[in-house]
């Protein structure tokens, strides 16, 4: 049983001196991973139920832990939770609060569980949910582009090669090319669900546990498809992070390409489309200007998505098995790419919606 008192980290039993303040600052991740609170609490409740099912803890302890975790969830939702950055991360904050609420029985929550399998379980649950959210946003964008295409089957525009006029084409045909791109993006995100659906819970630090746990129980309760097969690989694996970040980057490329085309078509040199006043800005000194800033924003943000992917690739390059502190950055990189992609897809959808009513009039 792990004891957590006096705001000390749970790993402090052998460490007699407090950590260097600067290391505490750079080593903590609370500001980043506190968005995992719901996944952490849900996984901890299921883990506790499994411990009771396997007769590792009794009914009274199980109920106390579950009650405490549900109360903590409500405190966080209502913004009444006492976050403490000295406790490193969201997992330790929740555990310390559980000790405050129910006493030393809170220590049973770490029976047959390490932070290694705890964190990666939370992360996979969050990524599964977020993958579905991204694909819902992609569905909305695809639907909008389909409406644009449907209204512009007979709208003729030049097709280009080398940015030179090549052949006359339908504006609908052109926009449908982007539908195909975004459909492929959906497939990329969906394909990663196979890896995300493998349950890490139960592998503990790296080699499992001597407790008689039931990984199939937690797999079913947490909506995974199967337990992971190798405990060392489970703790070390971040392929699912790379796949998610690559999917974000590929999708960002497609967003950047359509943004670039709209910018070019709107330029004085091409003058193929005009942009609604809702998606342009003016100039502080040149009153005639209408600048496509939102589209330029979409184009520019692609670089940060690439950067997050390359950062994760670099972290994993040459990293031995199994867990290292290097891997702590995985969540920050994923959260940044996810947040940016959601905003970009929604903004592009809003821009495309302006074409649904009178797109034919926008093509000159």
Question: Which ranges hold each PLM region?
Answer:
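A helix-coil-helix interface module used to build multimeric assemblies
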Residues: 2-208, 213-219, 226, 281-283, ...
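Short, charge-rich, low-complexity alpha-helical interaction segments
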Residues: 15, 344-350
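Metal-dependent nucleic-acid phosphoesterase active-site entry motif
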Residues: 55, 341, 356
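Charged, flexible cofactor/metal-binding loops and thiol motifs
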Residues: 127, 135, 150, 158, ...
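Single conserved hydrophobic/aromatic residue that forms the stacking wall/gate
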Residues: 355-364
């Amino acid at each position: 049983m792990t004891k957590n008192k006096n705001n000390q980290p749970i790993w402090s039993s052998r460490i007699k001196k407090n950590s260097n303040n600067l290391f505490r600052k750079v080593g903590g991740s609370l500001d980043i991973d506190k968005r995992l609170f719901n996944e952490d609490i849900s996984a901890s409740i299921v883990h506790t139920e499994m411990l009771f099912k396997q007769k590792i803890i009794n009914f009274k302890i199980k109920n106390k832990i579950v009650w405490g975790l549900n109360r903590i969830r409500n405190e966080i939702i209502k913004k009444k939770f006492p976050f403490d950055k000295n406790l490193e991360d969201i997992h330790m904050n929740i555990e310390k609060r559980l000790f405050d609420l129910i006493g030393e029985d809170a220590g049973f929550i770490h029976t047959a569980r390490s932070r290694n399998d705890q964190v990666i379980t939370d992360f996979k649950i969050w990524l599964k949910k977020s993958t579905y959210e991204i694909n819902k946003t992609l569905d909305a964008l695809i639907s909008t582009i389909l409406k644009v295409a449907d209204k512009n089957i007979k709208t003729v525009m030049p097709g280009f090669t080398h940015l030179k006029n090549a052949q006359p084409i339908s504006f609908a045909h052109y926009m449908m090319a982007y539908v195909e791109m975004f459909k492929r993006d959906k497939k990329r995100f969906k394909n990663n669900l196979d890896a995300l659906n493998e349950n890490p819970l139960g592998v503990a630090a790296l080699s499992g546990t001597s407790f008689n746990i039931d990984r199939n129980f937690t797999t079913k309760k947490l909506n995974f498809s199967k337990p992971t097969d190798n405990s060392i690989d489970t703790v070390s694996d971040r392929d699912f992070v790379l796949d998610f970040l690559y999917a974000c980057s590929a999708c960002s490329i497609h967003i950047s390409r359509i943004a670039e085309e709209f910018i070019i078509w709107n330029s004085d040199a091409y003058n193929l489309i005009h942009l609604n006043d809702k998606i342009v800005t003016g100039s502080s000194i040149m009153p005639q200007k209408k600048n496509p800033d939102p589209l330029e924003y979409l184009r520019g943000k692609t670089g940060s998505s690439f950067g997050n992917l390359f950062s994760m690739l670099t972290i994993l390059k040459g990293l031995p098995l199994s867990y290292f502190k290097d891997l702590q950055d995985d969540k920050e990189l994923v959260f940044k790419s996810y947040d940016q992609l959601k905003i970009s897809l929604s903004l592009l959808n809003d821009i495309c919606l302006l074409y649904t009513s009178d797109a034919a009039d926008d093509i000159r």
